[in-house]
């Protein structure tokens, strides 16, 4: 839960989460679990679940160096849209079907969440699709978000596991307006506050992550008009890519400047935990020097080695790490698992190796986010667990031992699965650690 400027676990220990995001969409996963088909139906669920189960195993395989602790799940509209209707893009909700959403929430999304949790992962869930470029208080999209989250938050399993499952209200708002379309520094608050209230009205007590404007990079208006929450268990979800935050790039990567710019655009980093739910980087691809595209801000971007944003670890990447380490309360999920580890290699051999193996050809492998985050996630995980919370104690010091399942319910004797062991010690203290039977 959110406590002051940090996330804390059930023992009150500070937690910073690091992981990956993915979407159960065949195209975005390189057709790895199924080839192209015209639509998505119940017969497609099983291969999808099996594929994701392998991913969850890979990203949590500490013996092979993978130390993910969180997974961001996109409830992809490819399942929730009515296949007889045509949506123009991911921001077009005209094809959304509440009946399909309810069906696949039970048959696909919740099973994916359960499997991620069984692998020891916290789960952040985002709604189907992305925000339209312009949103106005009380508009169709605002009502859509309320309806989606009402159905989600009312689910009994979701409510019971709200200490592990958190909600990211929307993906990448760009410009927010008042109901009459006018601009106001109160628009963001007025747009998302009712969505927060709707979720709490269903009895969901877990963390709610609130997005900002500018593709989730501008939060200054929340400093003037903060979200309020009956559970006091919310914070902000942010996106970070090179070229953002005062045009921080490989050419402009002063650490102190990045820290200052980030604090200026996300001022609540000093008072609340921040979750960066999208971030990635890889350098320009020397083989594609003549190709390119314009990014969100109209900046020319040369093709890179397989990420959304273009940058190098030794320049922009280390500047980002300086921001992360300076504040100490910023978690992150990389934009796709293949940018963290080599999915094809894992499916073939069971080996977990960093993503962007293709960069070795140009001696740029260590400049990509896969290699960097495989190392950083481990480093950050070790720092967190070195405080003793997961260290076992001498049997002589233990007065009593209790077992809890991942839902936090006390059990007599663990069967197969992940459990939290709580040991009461002679000095009155308690120690907890996670075990897998």
What are these regions (language model features)?
Residues 1-67, 83-91, 355-385:
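Non-catalytic accessory regions flanking glycosidase/transglycosidase catalytic cores in CAZymes
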Residues 5-8, 136, 421:
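Short acidic-hydrophobic surface loop/beta-edge motif
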Residues 9, 16-18, 295, 413, ...:
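Short capping micro-motif at the N-terminus of alpha-helices
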Residues 24, 28-31, 36-37, 41, ...:
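Extracellular glycoside hydrolase catalytic/binding regions
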Residues 39-70, 75, 79-166, 187-198:
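An active-site-proximal structural segment forming one wall of the substrate-binding cleft
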Residues 388-437:
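C-terminal outer-membrane/trafficking sorting elements
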């Amino acid at each position: 839960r959110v406590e002051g400027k940090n996330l804390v676990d059930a023992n009150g220990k500070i937690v910073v989460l690091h992981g990956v995001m993915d979407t159960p969409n065949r195209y975005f996963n390189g057709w790895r679990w199924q080839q192209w088909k015209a639509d998505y139906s119940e017969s497609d669920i099983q291969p999808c679940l099996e594929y994701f189960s392998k991913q969850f195993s890979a990203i949590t395989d500490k013996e092979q160096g993978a130390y993910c602790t969180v997974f961001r799940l996109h409830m992809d509209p490819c399942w929730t849209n009515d296949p007889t209707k045509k949506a123009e893009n991911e921001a077009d909700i005209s094809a959304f079907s509440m009946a399909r959403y309810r069906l696949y929430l039970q048959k696909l999304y919740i099973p994916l969440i359960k499997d991620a949790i069984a692998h020891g992962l916290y789960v952040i869930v985002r709604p189907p699709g992305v925000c339209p470029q312009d949103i106005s208080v009380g508009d169709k999209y605002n009502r859509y978000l309320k309806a989606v989250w009402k159905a989600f938050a009312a689910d009994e399993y979701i409510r019971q596991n709200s200490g592990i499952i958190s909600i990211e209200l929307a993906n990448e708002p760009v410009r927010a307006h008042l109901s009459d379309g006018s601009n106001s520094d109160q628009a963001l608050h007025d747009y998302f506050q009712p969505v927060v209230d709707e979720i709490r009205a269903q009895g969901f007590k877990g963390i709610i992550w609130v997005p900002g404007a500018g593709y989730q990079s501008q939060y200054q208006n929340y400093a003037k008009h903060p979200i309020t929450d009956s559970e006091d268990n919310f914070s902000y979800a942010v996106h970070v890519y090179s070229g953002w935050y005062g045009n921080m790039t490989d050419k402009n990567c002063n650490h102190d400047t990045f820290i200052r710019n980030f604090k200026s655009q996300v001022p609540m980093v000093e008072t609340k935990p921040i979750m960066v739910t999208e971030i990635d980087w890889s350098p320009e691809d020397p083989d594609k020097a003549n190709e390119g595209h314009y990014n969100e801000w109209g900046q020319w971007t040369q093709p890179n080695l397989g990420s959304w944003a273009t940058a190098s670890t030794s320049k922009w990447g280390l500047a980002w790490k300086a921001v992360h380490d300076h504040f100490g309360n910023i978690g992150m999920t990389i934009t796709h698992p293949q940018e963290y580890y080599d999915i094809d290699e894992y499916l073939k051999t069971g080996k977990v190796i960093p993503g962007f193996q293709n960069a070795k050809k140009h001696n740029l492998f260590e400049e990509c986010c896969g290699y960097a985050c495989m190392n950083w996630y481990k480093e950050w995980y070790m720092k967190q667990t070195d405080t003793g919370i997961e260290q076992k104690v001498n049997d002589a010091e233990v007065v009593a031992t209790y077992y809890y399942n991942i839902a936090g319910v006390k059990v007599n004797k663990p069967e197969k699965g992940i459990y939290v062991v709580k040991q009461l010690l002679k000095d009155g203290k308690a120690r907890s650690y996670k075990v897998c039977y």
